[in-house]
């Protein structure tokens, strides 16, 4: 398949949707994902890798551009046609993305699965192969997709359909000596979870009680709203079954892709990346959800930290764990560096290539490194030990992650922590001042976690740009079951 040159490698990026850092087979005794486990064993894991925003669309935009949301302008999940938006815009217009740069450098670029960055009716710039979900979530059978510009309901189980189309791309490029870039964007393990997945995946978990996931009292910030997350909080086992089964289905897809690369002799010249757009909590911290699973929006570790594994036989060490802090904004320059392609000049770029770390030429243990996150009016700065969160309108937070890894004790109001808090507040302020485009910034705008309906570059009013302001996001909490089946 395509390039056999390890110095101009093929690039395969597998991106899941809402996969918490705890939801990896080598960290979770309940999860069955042997193929992904082989990637971990055969590659290098960056185990403190952080999304740029703990929600789908802005996180994905940062992966593709190397910019933070305040510089690319995507600040909430994009509502799209599923929520009444017709004639969707392109949210990345005028921005340079990874596939665009690679295509210019001679790569064949393919996309299979979730896009969620505005219109997906036709291929985004840089792509020649395109199979795209029409929205950002929804059912796994009969899923809305675009096929050759026509809206269709996919008759196949969606996770397998995404794999099928990725396999078709690899097979179609088998006689092509150009290197490829293929992003396989699964919607799993995103909701809905119950009665969505074939028995061949759910039966793996027959009798499972999923004790690896906590049953905590609901957090006071948890958003009790009708739907999958509130159902999961009241009775978690059926939803946990779907969440875990969906990842086992992803694992089956990863197995098919790796087997095809092996069969065609391209595995040694293909760098495989496995990661997720943002994290997720399945009962952790007393919520089901990610950054918008609470009001105020949260920056807890399970929301902002995601799995990240790179496997490239012969170039990147097997079985190694790098615990340096790494940002999702680093993926864009790292992939270009791997391809031997110059990273375009961008004064607002927030990422840097971590290829030297992946090759073992540098370590990631610099205690001075800080990673940043943002979601509308909520921003985070995190060092190896401390996490500081500031909100335009809401509580300030400071956590000592060494002594309080579960983020239970907010020390922002302690006199003894004032120096640390003020130091991180200054670092955060100065950093965002350098990585910010005023016309794309939303710190002072009403981002509520209910979605974005228009790109900021259109210059429309807040009411025309964002779904309804947060308002009262807490309904009455129903009774919560802590039961586990016998």
PLM feature spans:
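Non-transmembrane alpha-helical segments in soluble domains
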Residues: 12, 16, 36-41, 64, ...
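Active-site-proximal cap/lid insertion segments
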Residues: 3-9, 16-31, 54, 134-161, ...
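Intrinsically disordered, low-complexity polar regions and short flexible loop motifs
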Residues: 404
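Active-site segment of extracytoplasmic enzymes that catalyze sulfate/phosphate-ester chemistry
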Residues: 13-16, 20-110, 129, 135-136, ...
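Active-site beta-strand termini and strand-to-loop segments that position acidic
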Residues: 312, 381-384, 391, 401
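Polar, surface-exposed loop/tail segments
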Residues: 33-34, 63, 114, 123, ...
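Short, structured coil segments at secondary-structure junctions
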Residues: 125-126, 167, 384
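Short, solvent-exposed turn/loop segments enriched in Gly/Ser/Thr/Pro and often Arg
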Residues: 25-32, 44-67, 75, 111-122, ...
């Amino acid at each position: 398949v395509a390039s056999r040159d390890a110095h101009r490698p093929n690039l395969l990026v597998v991106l899941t949707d809402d996969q918490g850092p705890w939801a990896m087979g080598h960290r979770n005794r309940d999860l069955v994902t042997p193929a992904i486990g082989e990637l971990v064993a055969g590659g290098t894991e960056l185990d403190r890798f952080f999304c740029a925003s703990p929600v789908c669309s802005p996180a994905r935009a940062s992966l593709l551009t190397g910019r933070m949301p305040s510089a690319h302008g995507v600040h909430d999940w994009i509502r799209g046609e599923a929520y009444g938006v017709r004639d969707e815009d392109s949210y990345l217009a005028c921005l340079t993305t990874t596939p665009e740069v690679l295509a210019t450098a001679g790569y064949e670029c393919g996309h299979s699965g979730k896009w969620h960055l505005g219109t997906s009716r036709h291929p985004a710039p840089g792509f020649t192969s395109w199979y795209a979900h029409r929205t950002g979530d929804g059912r796994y059978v009969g899923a809305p997709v675009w096929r050759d510009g026509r809206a269709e309901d996919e008759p196949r189980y969606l996770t397998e359909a995404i794999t099928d189309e990725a396999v078709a791309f690899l097979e179609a490029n088998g006689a092509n000596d150009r290197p490829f870039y293929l992003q396989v964007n699964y919607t799993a393990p995103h909701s809905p979870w119950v009665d969505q997945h074939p028995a061949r995946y759910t039966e793996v978990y027959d009798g499972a009680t999923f004790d690896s996931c906590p049953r905590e009292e609901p957090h006071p910030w948890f958003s009790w709203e009708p739907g999958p997350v509130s159902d999961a909080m009241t009775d978690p086992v059926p939803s946990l079954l779907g969440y875990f089964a969906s990842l086992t289905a992803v694992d089956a897809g990863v197995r098919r892709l790796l087997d095809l690369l092996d069969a065609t002799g391209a595995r040694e010249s293909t760098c495989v990346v496995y990661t997720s757009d943002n994290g997720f909590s399945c009962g952790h911290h007393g919520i089901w959800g990610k950054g918008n699973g609470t009001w105020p929006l949260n920056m807890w570790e399970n929301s902002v930290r995601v799995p990240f594994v790179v496997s490239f036989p012969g170039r990147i060490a097997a079985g190694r764990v790098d615990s340096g802090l790494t940002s999702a904004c680093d993926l864009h320059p790292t992939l270009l560096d791997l391809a031997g392609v110059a990273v375009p000049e961008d004064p607002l770029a927030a990422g840097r290539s971590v290829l030297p770390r992946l090759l073992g030429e540098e370590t990631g243990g610099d205690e001075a490194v800080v990673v940043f996150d943002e979601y509308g009016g909520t921003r985070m700065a995190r060092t190896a030990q401390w996490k500081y969160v500031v909100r335009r309108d809401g509580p300030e937070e400071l956590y000592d992650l060494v002594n309080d890894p579960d983020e239970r004790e907010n020390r922002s109001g302690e006199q003894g922590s004032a120096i640390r808090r003020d130091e991180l507040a200054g670092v955060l302020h100065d950093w965002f001042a350098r990585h910010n485009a005023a016309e794309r910034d939303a710190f002072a705008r009403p981002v509520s976690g209910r979605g974005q309906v228009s790109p900021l570059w259109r210059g429309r009013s807040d009411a025309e740009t964002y779904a309804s302001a947060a308002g009262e996001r807490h309904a009455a909490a129903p009774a919560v079951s802590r039961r586990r089946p016998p």
